[in-house]
From Swiss-Prot:
Alphabetically ordered keywords of this record: Cytoplasm, mRNA processing, Nonsense-mediated mRNA decay, RNA-binding
This protein's name: Enhancer of mRNA-decapping protein 1
Source organism of the structure: Debaryomyces hansenii (strain ATCC 36239 / CBS 767 / BCRC 21394 / JCM 1990 / NBRC 0083 / IGC 2968)
InterPro entries according to UniProt: PNRC-like_rgn
Subcellular location: Cytoplasm
Main location: cytoplasm
Signal sequence coordinates: none
Length: 352
């Protein structure tokens, strides 16, 4: 079945009928009826009359305001008679007291807030003099005044800068040097060669000027005269050989510069040998048989002797002991009877 096809009971009992209650008189019924008394006037919760913008309403509003002012004044008068006290015995301050003293104290307290340490805070609203005093009061532990770099420099403190005169003359590189009077006394540059170099060139170009060839090359036939007291060096512990202090007509070649050694006269051969020249000694008297013993030829190597072992005397021409002869160098026997030979003859004899 559909909803509209539901059966409806037509016959109902009288007990089931609900009688609606009597309606209270609505505002619509009383709308056009005049108000009987002023007690029906509507008012605000504080007792004031509602003003709907009508003239009559404005007049009634003034009356209601007067009534409310009277009501509040009566309440305050009643409150004055009753003194309220806090549990600690002090009088409470609700902020609505009209006494001049209390109001002045309250204003002072509000206008002068204090920090916990008792100082007055500075919110930047104080006068300039007050802020300057506070800045002057700050002092570092060492007694110096702190500098926060927030103070504006006064115009009086700054000195006016002196204006330098502008140079209007034409300037160029070196103008300051040329304009100075001391520059005139300086010597003028000359591009000529110095006289020393000219003299040196003249000496070299002269025909009489010649270079000594013996400066760079060692002389071969010059005689080197040893000093009277030659200085010799010997290693420690070796015996000093007995050498006559005054040699008789020694003939030796001068050594080279890098072979120079004090107390010795020697020369170097092209083969690289160094020959020491010993002073000439007269030969000993001939033996009884009239025959001299055999003499070792020149440049013949002899067994090397220790410097401490002195040679034993033999019936042959006396020879001086070896004076620190370098190793690998031949011993040279003195020529018989003081015979002199040249360097070329010496080379020829060595080749033969």
């Amino acid at each position: 079945m559909m909803a509209h096809e539901l059966p409806l009971s037509i016959h109902t009992k009288k007990s089931n009928h609900n009688v609606p209650p009597s309606k209270a008189p609505s505002a619509k019924t009383n709308k056009h009826k005049p108000s009987k008394s002023g007690s029906d006037d509507r008012g605000l919760p504080n007792g004031g009359k509602v003003d709907f913008g009508n003239k009559s309403g404005s007049q009634t509003n003034k009356k209601s305001n007067k009534k409310t002012s009277k009501h509040t004044s009566s309440n305050t008068s009643n409150n004055k008679g009753v003194t309220r006290v806090l549990p600690d015995g002090s009088k409470p301050n609700f902020g609505n007291e009209s006494s001049h003293q209390n109001g002045g104290n309250h204003k002072k307290q509000n206008n002068e807030p204090c920090l916990p340490n008792g100082e007055k805070p500075n919110f930047g609203e104080g006068s300039k003099s007050h802020s300057k005093k506070k800045n002057n009061d700050h002092v570092l532990p060492n007694g110096e005044k702190p500098n926060f770099f927030n103070e504006k420099s006064s115009k009086k403190a700054t000195k006016p800068k002196e204006k330098k005169p502008l140079i209007t003359e034409d300037t160029y590189a070196g103008s300051s040097f040329h304009s100075s009077p001391a520059a005139l006394n300086l010597p003028k540059p000359s591009f000529k060669t110095s006289p020393k170099t000219n003299d040196a060139k003249q000496h070299t170009t002269e025909p009489n000027y010649h270079v000594n060839p013996q400066v760079n090359t060692p002389p071969q036939h010059s005689v080197n005269v040893p000093p009277q007291h030659p200085v010799t060096t010997y290693p420690a512990g070796n015996g000093v050989p007995n050498i006559p202090t005054v040699p008789s007509n020694p003939t030796a070649f001068p050594p080279r510069n890098h072979y120079a050694q004090p107390g010795f006269s020697y020369y170097a051969t092209p083969q690289g040998y160094i020959n020491y020249q010993y002073p000439q000694v007269p030969p000993p008297p001939p033996p009884q048989g009239g025959v001299y013993p055999m003499v070792a030829p020149q440049y013949q190597q002899q067994p090397q002797q220790h410097p401490q072992q002195h040679p034993q005397p033999q019936p042959q021409p006396q020879q001086l002991p070896q004076q620190h002869r370098p190793h690998h160098l031949p011993a040279i026997a003195a020529p018989q009877q003081g015979h002199r030979i040249s360097f070329n003859e010496l080379l020829g004899s060595s080749k033969s």
